[in-house]
Each structure stands twice: as C-alpha cells, then as structure tokens.
Amino acid sequence: MVEDIIIVSTPYVPGYKITKTYGFTWGLIVRSRGIGGNIIASLRTIFGGEIHEYTELLNQSRQYALDRMKQHAREMGANAVVSVGFDSSDIGQNMSEVLAFGTAVTVEPETAASSPVRLG
C-alpha cells in the first residue's frame, strides 16, 4: 500500500488548501474470475443471494486500483487525490476491470489566518 496520500471523494480536503494541481491520476486492474469461481458462482445464481466469491474479488480489485492510483499520484509529486471515484466493467465473460480515478494535488494544512470565519 502507498501510505501518506490523502484520498477524498470531495473536490477539497477539509482543513487543507490545495497549493498545486497535477491533473488526472488513475489506477487500473483487470482480473480474471477463474473457472472455479465461475462454477461456484453459477451454482449460487440458481439459488439466489450474494455471490461472495465475486464480492471478494471486486473488493480486492478496488483496493489494488486505489493503491495504483496513489502510486501514480505520488510519482506525479502529489500528496493527495481529490474527487476520487471508481468505475468497473466486464471484459468478455471472465474478466472484470476496475478503475480508480481522481485529481492529483498537493495540499497544505490551513492556517488560522487562511481559514474562513464561520458564524453561528
């Protein structure tokens, strides 16, 4: 895992100001479900309910994509990624693609002088 990269889904980081924008950053992974997982999943679709094998595969894939996005942002010189989102799709019948994306930025803690005054 890439540490020390702030990740938020909002276009700003609360308590920080953006001092530099590097641009679009992403992390992508394509994973195969495998024949064993497909057989088990096919059996589960007959009876209904959650397909745990696919859920775990997609959770792992999201984490890998997020880690790759963080690494890409770090290579760009960023210490944060704002406006983070995910996208996923199937490729063929046995593969899934997961994309993590956002805007790589440098942020610094806001000082009391630069913080907006909030009333009430």
UniProtKB/Swiss-Prot annotation:
It holds the Pfam family YbjQ_1. It comes from the Archaea. Gene3D superfamilies: Hypothetical protein apc22750. Chain B. InterPro entries: UPF0145_dom_sf, UPF0145_YbjQ-like. Belongs to the UPF0145 family. This is UPF0145 protein UNCMA_30400. It comes from Methanocella arvoryzae (strain DSM 22066 / NBRC 105507 / MRE50).
